[in-house]
């Protein structure tokens, strides 16, 4: 009888196995390893995310889900040294720094050459300027998650979610002092990662729920050969309907 009761308690209404949600939120890409770009520390950068997802409940405790999400990974680097193409003497083919791997810009724009701190010290060139470098990589992501219900009473519920995702790069921008200077040539077209989140949900009307969801994302390979903020905090708000 006890086993039968547990099985009955674990069953879910067949009319509510599926749920579709829309959501939007804010995110912050963080530098957790004190990584540097061109000798300068990568700073955190805030962005927005939004998407749609569907979930299938196996029973009252477990569910699986997937969907599509637009998300942006970014970083800011202050006091980056660079030389403008207007300084024609520096871009002369005879200049040894122009071909230096250390001095190669991570931007596709040939009007600017971003240089490391060590190269700047070696050059001691009056044409060297400093500015703020912002890099933004936007992806369309497809997650695959498993959810476990840790609390479900009356109209409120709390779920823990974990899984992985694959993302396709759809936007790649590098800005210097607020002006677009091209793309990061080291960005990978596809990115992979893991995600962990908690969904706090409240039923507002029959099968309609609102939710808030703090989350953590980790990106494995945003760039080929450069450091980049790989850890991201997120906070999503959304609405879902079960059927």
Task: Please give the residue ranges for each predicted region.
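Conserved catalytic residues of ABC-type ATPase nucleotide-binding domains
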Residues: 1-106
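Outer-membrane beta-barrel strand-turn architecture
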Residues: 14, 56-60, 150-152, 170, ...
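Outer-envelope beta-barrel architecture signal
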Residues: 14-20, 60-64, 136-140, 154-160, ...
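Membrane-embedded beta-strand positions of outer-membrane beta-barrel proteins
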Residues: 20-24, 66, 144, 160-162, ...
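Transmembrane beta-strands of outer-membrane beta-barrel pores
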Residues: 24-32, 70-74, 150, 164-172, ...
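Outer-membrane beta-barrel translocator domains and adjoining extracellular loop/strand segments
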Residues: 32-38, 77-83, 172-179, 223-229
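Membrane-embedded beta-strand positions in outer-membrane beta-barrel channels/transporters
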Residues: 49-51, 141-145, 193-197, 236
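Outer-membrane beta-barrel "beta-signal"
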Residues: 231-243
């Amino acid at each position: 009888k006890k086993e039968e009761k547990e099985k009955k308690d674990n069953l879910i209404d067949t009319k509510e196995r599926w749920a579709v949600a829309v959501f939007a939120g804010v995110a912050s890409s963080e530098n957790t390893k004190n990584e540097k770009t061109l000798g300068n520390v990568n700073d955190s950068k805030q962005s927005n995310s939004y998407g749609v997802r569907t979930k299938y409940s196996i029973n009252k405790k477990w569910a699986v889900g997937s969907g599509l999400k637009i998300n942006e990974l970014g970083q800011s680097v202050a006091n980056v040294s660079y030389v403008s193409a207007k300084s024609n003497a520096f871009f002369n083919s005879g200049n040894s720094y122009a071909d230096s791997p250390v001095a190669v810009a991570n931007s596709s724009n040939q009007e600017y050459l971003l240089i490391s701190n060590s190269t700047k010290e070696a050059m001691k060139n009056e044409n060297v300027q400093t500015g703020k470098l912002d890099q933004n990589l936007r992806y369309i992501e497809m997650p695959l998650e498993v959810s476990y219900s840790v609390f479900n009473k009356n109209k409120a519920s709390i779920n823990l979610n974990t899984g992985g995702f694959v993302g396709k790069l759809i936007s790649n921008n590098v800005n210097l002092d607020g002006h677009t200077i091209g793309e990061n040539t080291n960005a990978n077209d596809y990115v992979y990662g893991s995600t962990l989140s908690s969904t706090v949900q409240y039923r507002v009307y029959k099968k309609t729920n609102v939710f808030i969801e703090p989350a953590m994302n980790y990106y494995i390979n945003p760039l080929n050969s450069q450091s980049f903020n790989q850890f991201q905090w997120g906070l999503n708000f959304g609405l879902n309907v079960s059927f």
